[in-house]
Amino acid sequence: FPDDAVKWRRVATSIHDNFEVFFDPQKGAYRKGFLLKEDGSLAFDNTLDVSSAFGVVMFAGKEFGAEKTLKSIEAIESTLLDKSPSGGLPRYEKDDYFASDPPHMGNPWFVATLWLVQYYVRTQQIDKAKHYVDWMIDKALPSGVWSEQINPSTGEPLSVAPLVWSHAEFINTALDISHAQQPKKP
């Protein structure tokens, strides 16, 4: 598999070297995606998507604190966060997967909300992070499990429950908060 490692390294370097293409200056946020067309040009999907910012927060290194990352988070907060009576964060604008209430931008997803919470932890906004951890605990089913997403108007669970992904991100987030609150060693 050494050839695969070389290919992956080459692709990672290409992504890093072309990082600017991932940002939509008009929207002020990272793009949801793009498609390389047969003629070599790019077709962009400029939908506001929390996973695009999460990828930068988790994997981009020096771009983490960059102005474009901050703008992306601000766009997500102002456009998507807590825009329904149930609170939380849909994955992206006009997400219609299990769409239950079309007037809203999409159904709140626990995973998407926790990705933003992990950004808050990394930027030492612990009170804000804890607010959404409490929100998630409040939305658990009586058995203590979480679904994939919730109805934006009623807060009722939608899609599969339990969803291991929701639980895994909750554990990751709890560990991140715990680590962030540990006294720093001199």
Labelled PLM ranges:
Residues F1-W8, V160:
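Aromatic-lined, polymer-binding surfaces characteristic
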Residues D3, S100, T154-P157:
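Short coil/turn segments at secondary-structure junctions
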Residues A5-V111, T123:
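Extended ligand-binding clefts on enzyme/binding-domain cores
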Residues S41-E67, P108-P186:
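C-terminal capping/lid segments that line or modulate ligand- or cofactor-binding pockets
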